[in-house]
Amino acid sequence: MKNILLCTDGSDFAQQSYPYAAWLASKLGGNIKVLYVTDIRAQKAVESVNLSGSIGLGTSEELLKQLVDLEHTKAKLNHQKAKLVLATAKNTLQQAGIESVQVMHKTGFLLDCLEDLKGDFDVIILGKRGETAKFAQGHLGANMERIIRSIPKPCLVTPKQFQTITKVLFAYDGSASCQKILQFLAGSSLLADLPLHIVTVGKTNQDPQAIANLGTAEKVLEKAGFKLEVELLVGHAEEAIVRYQEDNAIDLLLMGAHGHSRIRHLVIGSTTAQVLRKTSIPVLTFR
């Protein structure tokens, strides 16, 4: 995870992702690229306007010219905003001690840009919600869900308030995405110095598959030298995981974006999406 891509739109949520990016880069000795994407949809909408059928030809041409001029002005303002947001992010990261920071401004769709860049980064960081957060409280950012579903890289989803990471929780279900997390933890020094809690959610406290899953994870991570707390939870997965996180003052949650059994693939209403909605800590997902 040496190459970190930090997505920002300048919102409150995005700005709180900067210290998490700095923490990750400092722990890994990594570099950060900061990406700001100007949405192309508004520009395309004006280019496709045809007013000739609704008002007089001369009037429509004049109005369309005014609309185009307005869009040019908006484009300049968007460019200035992007420069300001990126400069603020770079300054914040450098003040936090990160020397290797690059900034990028692209126009288009965020997901398309990430697809183009996915060979250039190892992990992506973005806020749980973006600029429209105050208008859709309780919802996840639309970009965030699509990114987790589509980009085959770990994704750190950050909350509105930064807090120092001192304890980590791994929600393990034995799925392929959780196996990736297990391999990452065993082979990385990122979280090796922090207490690690492992939980899985079973149908009962005697669930044989859940017990086997916990045993597998515990064996691998004990061998890797982690100080572990292991717990079998019972109930609705998302509620049990969030309750455990709150009761044990966990600062970082790791879970698979796609799972099976009690932790299912990421769709609206799934365990991963529900946990992301309900928790107030950063969540590192693996696909």
UniProtKB/Swiss-Prot annotation:
<dbReference type="InterPro" id="IPR006016">
    <property type="entry name" value="UspA"/>
</dbReference>
<dbReference type="InterPro" id="IPR006015">
    <property type="entry name" value="Universal_stress_UspA"/>
</dbReference>
<dbReference type="InterPro" id="IPR051688">
    <property type="entry name" value="USP_A"/>
</dbReference>
<comment type="similarity">
    <text>Belongs to the universal stress protein A family.</text>
</comment>
<dbReference type="Pfam" id="PF00582">
    <property type="entry name" value="Usp"/>
</dbReference>
<protein>
    <recommendedName>
        <fullName>Universal stress protein Slr1230</fullName>
    </recommendedName>
</protein>
